[in-house]
């Protein structure tokens, strides 16, 4: 047993890879507060709540799955976006089951997802003191700064390993490669010899963990280039476009001029800057209809902003998916979000405008550098770009997305779902896993 802490610590560090990057540590206090509060006492309080509501709470919440998980292809999801990215595989792989960890919030899809029991997770917290000490020696003060995130990650690997041994799924398909529970399941699959596949569900950055699946279905060359910068690429890779966009590509925006402008924001975008931007555009371009769409995970109080700017419309991301939102817009203004790519695919004119000034996240996805979207450096520049688009919007903006979406301009354009399903089925067959 004395030889185990080394491998165990390395595994935990792998699971927490994103939490110890410079870019994560440099997130704004407002963004970090919802993940890991700055105050040690608040972090400790959240750990206490986790113990009561999750670790102890799960003991009194038995998991009763309607679908049989034995020998099935698991589609592992951590969010509603993940669900939408993987749901199409169910039609192509009879018996495929959407699964998530016990208590995971999948939004409006909670009732459609089977749960993996986490009741035994509490048994593995004897590891925590040694793990935190080991991470302190390796990572320094960041281990203490994020002691709550380290706490949450304990036990996933062991519990998921037990579930894999019990159910023996034919394969596990992921749409997330960096959340702690997803990474723990990936590592457990490697240990138990379960084949793994990955379907990219959003744009990626060079700060992600190395691509570590047996099969990776990426959207385009951009994603592959970035993953190569992250480290060695494991397994097979296929470029299949964006499956979740298929149904919408035939309904691209044909408006000759911009009348409706959507602003997408997330927790990284300060509310004062959002208010300033909306107020400026409402005054400078009064003919435009403005709609604000907060990210579904953004739980800040937008009430004062609603009262300050009653003319602004709102999109509820919990009820309206991103493509449904974009279908109601002619232009998009946003900072660092993959919505820029989704907008461009629908020929919605998209503009990169930063509401915050963190230098580590400037052009985080490289959209400006690769010519996908123009940058507005300040409010007058943003107003000028939108003013020009209000007179004329090009009809061929979507061609800019070819580097990000491998099927654009090919016979498979708008058919990424059957392409991905075919590649996945062939891989399962070649791996000796019945499709």
Where on the chain are the PLM-derived regions?
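C-terminal amphipathic helix plus adjacent low-complexity
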Residues: 1-35, 39-42, 384-435
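Active-site and donor-binding regions of nucleotide-sugar-utilizing enzymes
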Residues: 1-244
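Conserved catalytic-core segment of nucleotide-activated headgroup transferases in glycan assembly
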Residues: 91-93, 238-308
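Catalytic donor nucleotide-activated moiety binding site of glycosyltransferases and closely related
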Residues: 135-141, 176-179, 286-318, 361
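Short acidic active-site motifs
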Residues: 159, 204-205, 320-324, 381
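Catalytic binding pocket for nucleotide-activated donors in carbohydrate/polymer assembly enzymes
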Residues: 213, 234-235, 239, 338-409
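Donor nucleotide-activated moiety binding/catalytic core segment of transferases
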Residues: 297-341, 345-346, 355-357
